[in-house]
């Protein structure tokens, strides 16, 4: 029931855009898994974080059309199962006209959406009454988040891209880490930010939340990262030099923000001899589009006083107090 002709938008495009949602019961007992019902929602769903079941109600965030279409907007719809029919019982429509959703997070009675065209509006929604959801607050800042993580009930920890405003649009630039205070949902505030590299810098965590490793017991944030420098990201030019490929580990707290603890180098597999060149940079171009961001390191695990970083070719073990020194390395190609 979903009608989408292509990725882009052009003037005069009028196709309807709908998504069908199917509900199933899942269980281990015989015949415990089965079809329960369906419903239709306007627009398209970004990813799994755009759907959430809470106290018997399904909340869904969608975008209709695509930026910069004047018809582009987003919607939060709340569904209730009524005898096999998923019916909309509450809705907030026409959110952020001309923009599209870049990240979503539902947390109990609240919802958070980041949209983007040239700035990053963070919207906070009150979903306590499923039949009367409402917008509580909004914050507009440069850039956008592609993943939002609940640091605690009143703070969001996010990763995304910084952006340089060009008037009618914006260039995405370096990788952006942010902490938002949403204690007062009517007045969300950016309390800390960290920009890594310039345009062309990338992380697997930008497009895959499994690469985003926030370890709350130690207030540590471990992120796969490709760092590019040089060039002029504000004018759309990609970085001219890759200065780091590997895992970056930050101390991340609400009180103090981000402090780089250290780095675990994983030189890119395309590098000659798997080492840095004579200028101290990694031999690989700096170019990526935000929707297919990736990095050499794919995952990390923090265990006791050690961090394990995993790429497609190796696993490294490093002590959290001496990240630049490898304790052990295991090749996955031999």
Residues of each region from the PLM?
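Beta-sheet-rich non-transmembrane sensory/scaffold domains
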Residues: 1-334
